[in-house]
Amino acid sequence: DGVRLTVLHPGEAPPAGEPVLLRGSASNARTCVLRIATDHGVAALLAGDIERAQEQALVRSGAPLAADVLVVPHHGSKTSSSDAFLDAVQPALALVQSGYRNRFGHPAAPVVQRYRDRGITLVASPACGAASWSSQDGQLRCERERSKRYWHHRVVGDGAEGDEGQ
């Protein structure tokens, strides 16, 4: 079908004695990182909840990280989206999955700035709603825009492109 799915993280199996199900922040370290690529050279990277340590390990491993679209690691937390990782992925578009005015402050302002410094279009789910992206035309479609009649309030200050409040 012309699509390749590659699991980049976690590796084969946890080391002997390490539990498969981890709690707390350690469970973020075991999240799935998936690269989806087409035969036409278009790719998306779904980074799950990895943090800086896992990003660095992926960069050092030489894994195929380059992607047109990146689902931002760990909802854009301050422990993710390191310079080295963003330089390896080099996405044109990054999607942040975060709740509107969430208690964690995701995406974190320094993370948003790292994307902006690289000219990466950053779109957050509070502003976009459900996002769909096509590898054929490279277009992002926001459900919030397509179904405006269902949305009764403006989203402000969520750290994404098109913020009304910035």
Question: What annotation goes with each model-predicted range?
Answer:
Residues 55-132:
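Cap/insert and terminal regions of metallo-dependent hydrolase folds
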Residues 1-69, 127-166:
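Core dinuclear metal-dependent hydrolase active-site scaffold
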